[in-house]
């Protein structure tokens, strides 16, 4: 079993993790993208983005690089890495993107955010997979003696982004954010990063 095999019902039955849809209401302020990011995203519109790989290269990675530079490399980015949360229970598998607190480690140190590219542009499938990865990330951190009250993730088609908060249960955001309003998207990411800056020392 792998992260992509889990349903939300599986997470509740196997781990007692329930889920709820609600507006997460991020206390965020829009962030004007740099000229570099504007050009990257403008260039992406001219490309035939037909696959998850193309989407990550032309859309997701530039946004993550922008955020990393804005935050003086507070986090590092792992792409396509395997994260084992609980092998016996199937919480394992390749992750599209993991943001981890930057400790200069070659391995994933403290996973704090997961991004799942929605296969076949199916956000619901992405929500399920991302939710399983967040449960796995919590198990991974606990094995290292790291307790975190909240973890965040999102799934994206490139054009549409939907966020998840994992605390006492999974909270799936009713709101969606759009690449066409990238300043608002950057603001949501920044509010999450600011939360981690205040809780991770």
Named regions from a protein language model:
Residues 74-105:
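Active-site metal-binding core of divalent-cation-utilizing nuclease and nuclease-like domains
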Residues 90-94, 109-113, 128:
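Short connector loops at helix/strand junctions that flank enzyme active sites
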Residues 1-65, 198-201:
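Charged, often low-complexity linker/regulatory segments
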Residues 59, 95-102, 111-120, 133:
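Conserved catalytic cores of phosphodiester-cleaving nucleases, focusing on short active-site segments
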Residues 104-110, 144-148:
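Short, solvent-exposed loop/turn segments that connect beta-strands within catalytic domains
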Residues 155-201:
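Short terminal or interdomain "cap/linker" segment that borders an active site or interface and mediates
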